[in-house]
From Swiss-Prot:
Its cofactor is Zn(2+). It catalyses: S-adenosyl-L-homocysteine + H2O + H(+) = S-inosyl-L-homocysteine + NH4(+); S-methyl-5'-thioadenosine + H2O + H(+) = S-methyl-5'-thioinosine + NH4(+). Its EC number is 3.5.4.28, 3.5.4.31. It comes from Halalkalibacterium halodurans (strain ATCC BAA-125 / DSM 18197 / FERM 7344 / JCM 9153 / C-125) (Bacillus halodurans). PANTHER family: AMIDOHYDROLASE-RELATED DOMAIN-CONTAINING PROTEIN (PTHR43794:SF11), AMINOHYDROLASE SSNA-RELATED (PTHR43794). Zn(2+) binds at residues 66, 68, 215, 305. Keywords: Hydrolase, Metal-binding, Zinc. Coiled coil: none annotated. The gene is mtaD. This is 5-methylthioadenosine/S-adenosylhomocysteine deaminase. Catalyzes the deamination of 5-methylthioadenosine and S-adenosyl-L-homocysteine into 5-methylthioinosine and S-inosyl-L-homocysteine, respectively. Is also able to deaminate adenosine.
Length: 438
């Protein structure tokens, strides 16, 4: 048995055959069995479910490698402020009033939004009610990399309690949901975690064999303050303290890196960078030197950050902005070609999240894919599929989304979420929290 998807153009992500103009693929029990050009034979379609793509484009599900879904009620809550003021004056006071119900509905809203624009895997770095999110992921079908993030601006006993919570969460949920949930360890940032606390977290990550995630060099201010306190750039400090060696890290942002810091990243192939261009632009943080990182062989993937600083979770738009921004920043139209941008949104993210089972469409990989109907004005003429996916596509063009071969959206209709209820609950809980702040 199984399912065959026929009459489709396939962006495989494979180096040897990145694009199949007219082809088909088969999956069974959540795994891709075969990918081929042409039309399946009568023998191949005997006793299997057949999905006629009718000319749709298929690509790997997109992978959002940095986000805070729990902040999704904060969309538009505060704009046009520097990062530190934005965090301390607007974000953290609101989050301090959020209860379990508010965080739950924020995440429901975020997961649905991501699925509707083609994201099949997301990373959540947050500190509140993480078990609730893991349960929702198991029930509602996406793939997720989850972590209980830790801020260390507290006593050592409080740090140890946070670390205990993070380890318990990580070890409890890693591999759950038929493998759809994996976990990481996450010191929030060098400016919120003293080196002694990060060392404790790194040691625990080593003990339980999990990768690590943190914010790094997002703003010039945090880099300058770290230099005043410790005498060096935070990434250099990580290197000096031995945090990077032989460890799998995913660093979010990396906007303010000089040649020394780029050299360090190049020397550590297990350290990856999540590029969040739209959040960095909106918060005035700057433009990461992604082109130089790519030229050095550093693995770059994409993240949206939270809707509080973006203000959406559309990786299609993030992919386009990432490509265009580097072309303008380095004055080179060849920077980040379409194929590279697609890789950043798919297989590079899989590598960064230590998920070798996804990111491409090929035999043996999990059946995480999306389908796009090119019958819309802004995708004509539809000859140039790779170009259109980066420079013309909109997230709303995604029609079908599958994870592990299970449909999460068909013909733009969510299968595991009540979209009308999501909108009602989001507004109700936002107003309720605002009343608490008065």
């Amino acid at each position: 048995m199984g399912t065959i998807v026929k009459n489709v153009s396939i962006v495989t992500g494979q180096a040897e055959a990145p694009f199949i103009r007219h082809g088909y693929f088969k999956f069974a029990d959540g795994v891709i069995v075969s990918v081929a050009e042409g039309t399946p034979s009568p023998e191949e379609i005997d006793r299997v479910e057949v999905i006629d793509g009718k000319g749709k484009w298929v690509m790997p599900g997109m992978i959002n490698t940095h986000g805070h879904l729990g902040m999704s009620l904060l969309r538009g809550h505060s704009d046009d402020l520097p990062l530190q003021s934005w965090l301390t004056e607007k974000m953290w006071p609101f989050e301090g009033k959020m209860d379990r119900e508010a965080v739950h509905h924020a995440r429901q809203l975020a997961m649905a939004e991501m699925i509707k624009s083609g994201t099949t895997t997301f990373l959540e770095m947050y500190h509140l009610y993480m078990d609730d999110l893991a349960e929702a992921v198991v029930e509602q079908g996406p793939r997720a990399v989850l972590m209980r993030s830790m801020i260390g601006l507290c006593s050592e006993s409080e740090q140890r309690e946070k670390l205990k919570e993070a380890v318990t969460f990580a070890t409890t949920w890693n591999g759950d949901g038929n493998g759809r949930i994996t976990t990481m360890m996450a010191p929030h940032a060098p400016y919120t975690c003293p080196p002694s606390f990060i060392e404790m977290i790194v040691d625990e990550a080593d003990r339980i064999d999990l990768p690590l995630h943190t914010h790094m060099a997002e703003t010039q201010r945090e880099v300058e303050e770290h230099r005043k306190t410790y005498g060096v750039h935070p990434l250099v400090h990580f290197e000096q303290l031995g945090f990077l060696k032989d460890r799998h890290w995913l660093l979010a942002h990396c906007v303010h890196l000089g040649e020394e810091e780029l050299d360090i990243l190049e020397q550590h192939p297990s350290v990856h960078v999540s590029h969040n261009p739209m959040s960095n632009l909106k918060l005035g943080s700057g433009i990461a030197n992604v082109q130089s990182m790519l030229e050095r062989g550093i693995n770059i993937c994409l993240g949206t950050d939270s809707v509080a600083s973006n203000n959406h979770l559309d990786l299609v738009e993030e992919m386009r902005i990432a490509a265009l921004l580097q072309k303008g920043a380095v004055l080179d139209p060849t920077a980040i070609p379409a194929e590279t941008a697609i890789a950043m949104a798919t297989k590079n993210g899989a590598k960064a999240l230590r998920l070798p089972q996804v990111g491409t469409i090929e035999a043996g990989k999990r059946a995480d894919f999306i389908m796009i109907d090119p019958q819309c004005l802004h995708l004509q003429p539809h000859e140039h599929v790779m170009s259109h996916l980066v420079y013309a596509l909109k997230g709303a063009d995604v029609q079908d989304v599958f994870v592990e071969g299970a449909p999460l959206m068909l013909n733009k209709e969510l299968k595991t979420f009540d979209e009308e209820k999501l909108q009602f609950e989001a507004n109700a809980h936002y107003q309720r929290i605002c009343e608490k702040l008065k």
